[in-house]
Amino acid sequence: MINVKGTDYIVLGKLGQGMSGEVLRVQEVKTGELRAIKCVDLSCIEKETAQGCLEEVSMLDRLRAPCIITMFTYEIKSNLLYVVMEMGDTDLSKLLRSMSREKQLPLTMILYYWTEMLTAVNHIHDNGVIHSDLKPANFLLVRGRLKLIDFGIASTVNADMTSVVKNTSLGTLNYISPEAINDIGGNGDSPSDNNQYKINFKSDVWSLGCILYSLVYGQTPFQHIRANWAKVNAITNPNHKIAFPPADSTNRRGYTSPPPFLIDVMRRCLQHDRKARPTVSQLLQIPYVGCNCPPASSLPSIPPSILSKIKHSLEENEWRQLLEALERRKPLQ
């Protein structure tokens, strides 16, 4: 039993374990509602990490929106931080892994989740926040919609600034931008020795490009490079060419080549020069579903097993809206 701000919760199990703490699956005694509680022992982690946890609470409170995971309340007791949040059905990473590796993710799903991610990241950027660790595991599926989570290493950019210098941990290597690895004033050939690096909103755009690439091709742009040192060199090398094959290289059954406009979006997001990358707002202005897409008859349908995972978490009107959107191949309103 855990008590947070006078409310009792029954612990049902563990949802996850991170470097700074654990996330528990709980049930509120009074209402029976299922929740997730993030528990962090602030006395057992580094000062910078503890500060990041407290800043995450502040950001969750400030960034409240349908596209951001909801924080209901929090409390600090005897150096233990408890954050009560809504519980999702699964995260995007697990959902993607649940699909057969021999099947390509349907284009309708790619476009749906891509626009959901853009909407969430655009919201935090509009509020001056750089996430710094965008990856499929940090997008939670809640009642059929994606919500952004984990602001532990996010940063706030002041209105009169365009970037921030960070001394905290980097994001996940397969999704990290070149500028987040390069040392300030360095030559870009190796990671920073002092762990200090400079990022801006375009760093999140690179990460989004890596996620889109993985949705389309089944792996991130640098995932085929096994050694971390070689991967770092490739990411930071401005002359490294990222492959955007029009045909499948993994021989998955039923593969459909990505439409040219989607390859162009990936190319723009994965520009080594961050100034050449579009903003998230600009990415949202692209008509992802419409004249640029293949005919509806050529688009693969969403497997029933995946639809069933989405259906049970939607209200009837939301489920009907999703079906209509997939049928007409146009974004949800």
Language-model region placement:
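Regulatory extensions flanking the kinase catalytic core
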Residues: A276-R320
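A conserved loop-to-beta-strand element in the N-lobe of protein kinase catalytic cores
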Residues: S78-E86, S93-K94
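Conserved N-lobe beta3->alphaC-helix segment of eukaryotic protein kinase catalytic domains
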Residues: V40-L63
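Activation segment signature within eukaryotic-like protein kinase domains
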Residues: Y113-W114
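Glycine-rich ATP phosphate-binding loop
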Residues: E22-L42
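Activation-segment/catalytic-loop signature of the eukaryotic protein kinase fold
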Residues: Y74
